[in-house]
Regions:
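Residue(s) in the substrate-gating loop at a strand-loop-helix junction
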Residues: 142
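C-terminal helical subdomain
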Residues: 180, 184-185, 191-243, 252-253
């Protein structure tokens, strides 16, 4: 399949968390490539700034993705722009709280955004993709679940759940809907409010994210990329022996 599938370019790209940081950079990058972009975010003023930077192809929809009724309404309004063909699940919270300072309510509030918002946006996108059998979902992910840091219990748990969702969707959908492609992407440590001061500029990472989002290939469903390169899944002993006997080498894909 082509790296830049024209079917994606005639449809709408929807980016959650488009009011700042990586989400804003992704929206600007996609709009710069000629796609109409719907940007969701909690703050209308922040989305207005994204619109100023992205130009006329960006459409702002203030929305808290933890409010599923509001999210449904935002998707319905975005339908008027163009048929949705690309969803980038980017919105996230990182509250930096010790677990002993968490309450069930505060912990679940993070889960509601980082996992619940991703789940709900994905389900709403699939409502639009399944009738045509075509679509693209890119989930902005991390390895926080594998190596949790102190004061990050809610964040790590929620991001791990979102990565599990990608694999579960592959199991449920890949055989029936091979042209609905779902991939996890790790953008790296960024110089954003959720990142680190000396991190990568989000504008640089957004170029990789946009390139991967516009790469439509059924083989990418369930794959994980870090920055511009695929991370191959662990390989069992039997598979390793088979590859050795057949003189096969696994090669990660790159952008």
């Amino acid at each position: 399949m082509p790296r830049n599938d024209p079917r994606l370019r005639v449809g709408l790209a929807l980016v959650t968390g488009a009011g700042s940081g990586l989400g804003r950079a992704l929206a600007i990058e996609l709009a710069g490539r000629g796609l109409p972009v719907a940007g969701l975010g909690r703050r209308a003023d922040a989305l207005a700034e994204t619109a100023r930077l992205a130009g006329p192809d960006f459409h702002a929809f203030p929305c808290d993705i933890a409010d599923f009724d509001a999210l449904r309404a935002a998707f319905a309004k975005a339908d008027a722009i163009a048929p949705l063909t690309l969803l980038i699940n980017n919105a996230a919270l990182y509250p930096h709280r010790d677990f002993l300072d968490e309450t069930p309510e505060s912990f679940m509030a993070t889960m509601q955004v980082n996992f619940g918002g991703t789940l709900a946006a994905t389900r709403l996108a699939l409502d639009r993709f399944v009738p045509t059998g075509f679509g693209r979902i890119l989930n902005v992910a991390t390895f926080a679940d594998l190596h949790p840091l102190p004061t990050a219990a809610a964040y790590s748990t929620s991001k791990g759940a979102a990565r599990t969702l990608t694999r579960a969707l592959k199991a449920d959908l890949a055989d029936r809907f091979p042209d609905i492609v779902i991939t996890d992407w790790m953008p790296g440590m960024l110089a954003t409010t959720m990142g680190i001061p000396d991190g990568l500029p989000p504008e640089v990472s957004a170029k990789w994210g946009a390139e991967l989002a516009l790469w439509h290939d059924p083989a990418l469903t369930g794959a994980t990329f870090e920055q511009d390169r695929e991370i191959l899944p662990p390989q069992g002993l039997k598979s390793k022996l088979k590859d050795a006997l057949l003189l096969r080498r696994r090669t990660p894909r790159a952008l």
